């Protein structure tokens, strides 16, 4: 028995288990041993609290194969759970709330699984996967609310799946994007399938300036290429349900080859679907159920081909984004304080988590081993009422 999680982690050999009893642990856990599993016996009552002083709840940097399960991290200055420069990682049944940057954060890391998890109160994003190609990562069955963004993915993609999840009441919803500030641009080949993306208009959410720019949009593909947005329910956004737009940083990044297919998009105040920017080539909208588009006639009646060029793009959305950036840079926006966001409701525990004899599987080839049928993704139950 150890007094701190850190002491137990330091004493554990590769392949071992750290089973954490109920309690509030005022520490930052730094993992330096590969292939260990850190598991709480009660997701809602095993809490790592950063006291608004420590950088992260749990940080796994340069150490492969680590698994974190059934734990809550709150009140860190930066991130709840942070995986950086690793090959093989998994976070299951974890809760991250009221952390100063991201909730669950994977950066420069591949072969990952994040599932059955929850994030709120993050001024950047509840969930983030950045700077990886191919990422070989899946985010499945998560809830992200009251964040700057529900999901952000800068310069990531390649077998990157975001499925069967709920993104609601954030400032902006899901934002695959390209920036010059990270390696491996552009963002590409992300699969956003079977999610419920709802009411991301939350002006009271915490947010940085870049997140404020996304306010009122469900899915924003900003300078991304060859993404597939399919079979989602996207409703009640004050600007766009889905918008495909160029991104501008040090360089100008057009959006190419994105497929927006078979989504149900409802009650968007400006337009359900939009295409904006210059030289956006080969973007395809087909089979979607919607009412309005910007510009009109954005959806083709048949199969999309190479003849779908920038003729359908509208520059007014781009100018609107530029105007909002100017507004933000003048400091003319108010957001919520991540330190005082609401405490989330109790979340589902991992089955049999309090058993020391539960199987231990280090995060090795976790993406390939993850048993999910990507051709038959189920929507969250919250979306069902919109399908009838």
Question: What would you call each of these model-derived segments?
Answer:
Residues 1-3, 17, 22, 35-77:
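Right-handed parallel beta-helix/beta-spiral solenoid domain characteristic of secreted/periplasmic
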Residues 23, 34, 41-43, 53, ...:
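Solvent-exposed coil/turn segments that connect beta secondary-structure elements
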Residues 25-31, 49-56, 77-83, 100-107, ...:
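Short glycine/acidic-rich loop motifs that flank beta-strands on beta-rich extracellular proteins
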Residues 39-45, 64-75, 87-102, 110-125, ...:
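Right-handed parallel beta-helix
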Residues 53, 93, 194, 207-214, ...:
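Extracellular beta-rich repeat passengers
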Residues 253, 268-388:
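Acidic, glycine- and Ser/Thr-rich low-complexity intrinsically disordered tracts
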Residues 1-7, 11:
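Right-handed parallel beta-helix/beta-solenoid
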């Amino acid at each position: 028995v150890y007094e701190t999680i850190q002491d137990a982690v330091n004493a554990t050999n590769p392949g071992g288990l750290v089973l954490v009893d109920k309690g509030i642990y005022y520490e930052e856990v730094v993992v330096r041993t590969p292939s260990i599993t850190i598991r709480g016996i009660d997701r809602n009552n095993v809490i790592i609290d950063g006291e608004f002083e420590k950088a992260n709840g749990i940080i796994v940097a340069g150490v492969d194969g680590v698994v974190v399960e059934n734990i809550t991290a709150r009140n860190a200055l930066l991130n709840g759970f942070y995986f950086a420069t690793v090959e093989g990682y998994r976070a299951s049944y974890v809760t991250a709330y009221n952390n100063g940057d991201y909730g669950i954060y994977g950066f420069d890391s591949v072969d990952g699984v994040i599932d059955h998890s929850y994030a709120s109160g993050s001024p950047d994003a509840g969930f983030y996967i950045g700077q990886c190609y191919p990422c070989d990562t899946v985010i499945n069955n998560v809830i992200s609310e009251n964040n700057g963004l529900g999901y952000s993915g800068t310069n990531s993609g390649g077998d990157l799946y975001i499925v069967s999840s709920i993104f609601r009441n954030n400032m902006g919803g899901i934002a695959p994007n390209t920036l010059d500030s990270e390696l491996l641009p552009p963002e590409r080949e992300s699969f956003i399938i079977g999610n419920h993306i709802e009411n991301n208009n939350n002006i009271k959410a915490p947010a940085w300036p870049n997140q404020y720019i996304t306010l009122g949009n469900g899915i924003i593909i900003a300078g991304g290429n060859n993404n597939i947005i399919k079979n989602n329910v996207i409703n009640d956004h004050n600007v766009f349900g889905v918008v495909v737009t160029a991104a501008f940083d040090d360089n100008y990044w057009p959006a190419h080859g994105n497929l927006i297919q078979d989504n149900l998009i409802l009650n968007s105040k400006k337009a359900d679907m939009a295409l904006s920017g210059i030289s956006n080539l080969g973007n395809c909208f087909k089979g979607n159920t919607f009412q309005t588009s910007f510009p009109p006639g954005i959806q083709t009646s048949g199969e999309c081909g190479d003849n779908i060029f920038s003729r359908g793009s509208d520059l007014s959305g781009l100018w609107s984004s530029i105007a909002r950036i100017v507004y933000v840079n003048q400091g003319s926006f108010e957001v919520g304080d991540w330190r005082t966001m609401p405490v989330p409701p109790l979340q589902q525990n991992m089955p049999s988590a309090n058993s020391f004899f539960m199987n231990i599987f280090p995060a090795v080839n976790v993406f390939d081993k993850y048993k999910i049928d990507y051709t038959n993704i189920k929507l969250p139950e919250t979306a069902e009422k919109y399908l009838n």
